[in-house]
A protein has these predicted regions:
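A short, N-terminal "cap"/entry segment at the start of jelly-roll beta-barrel domains
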Residues: 2-6, 13-56, 97-99, 106-107, ...
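Extracellular/periplasmic catalytic domains that process cell-envelope and extracellular macromolecules
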Residues: 49-53, 74, 82, 99, ...
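Structural motif
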Residues: 55-57, 78, 126-128
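Ligand-binding loop in jelly-roll beta-barrel domains
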Residues: 96-97, 111-139
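Extracytoplasmic low-complexity repetitive segments enriched in small/polar residues
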Residues: 23, 45-49, 60-64, 89, ...
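Glycine- and acidic-residue-biased ligand/ion/polar-headgroup-sensing regions
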Residues: 75-95, 102-104
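Conserved short histidine dyad/triad with adjacent acidic residue
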Residues: 56-74, 96-100, 109-113, 135
Length: 145
């Protein structure tokens, strides 16, 4: 399972020429109610060996003190998130608030509620890459609850 998740994370980085039919242009995603946060779809590609499923890479950038509102994701979405820079405070469902630092990861299962997602610092930027595996037709990736 860990190898599959690592492969999906690597697949989220655009690789010129290798995935010619993949979307590699960035598209900002509107997340209403977030503070000092930018969410950008940086990659998407249908999974050729899993009909009806796609992988999407989403870059989340928090400025100092930045945060997202409590949210969930499409019911079909499995998410593997890796902190690229800084530190992120995350709380999924009724679990504890956990601080993840650069290089650390967590996952969210279909139906999970992301109660807390914020930058742990009030002075430094933080970034994470969330890799979604979900139904191909899903376009609204962040849903308030």
């Amino acid at each position: 399972m860990r190898r599959i998740l690592c492969a999906l994370t690597l697949a989220a980085y655009p690789i010129g020429g290798v995935l010619a039919d993949a979307q590699t242009s960035a598209t900002e995603i509107a997340v209403h109610g977030s503070h000092n946060a930018k969410v950008t779809l940086v990659y998407e590609h249908e999974l050729p060996n899993v009909p009806g499923k796609s992988v999407k890479g989403v870059l989340v950038e928090y400025g100092p003190g930045g945060a997202s509102v409590a949210h969930t994701h499409p019911a079909s979405a499995f998410i593997y998130a890796t902190v690229l820079e800084g530190a992120i405070v995350s709380k999924v469902n009724e679990g504890p608030e956990t601080v993840y630092r650069a290089g650390e990861s967590w996952s969210e299962l279909p139906g999970d509620r992301h109660a807390v997602s914020r930058n742990a610092s009030s002075t430094e930027q933080a970034r994470l890459l969330a890799v979604f595996v979900l139904d191909t037709g899903e376009t609204n990736l962040v849903l308030p609850y």
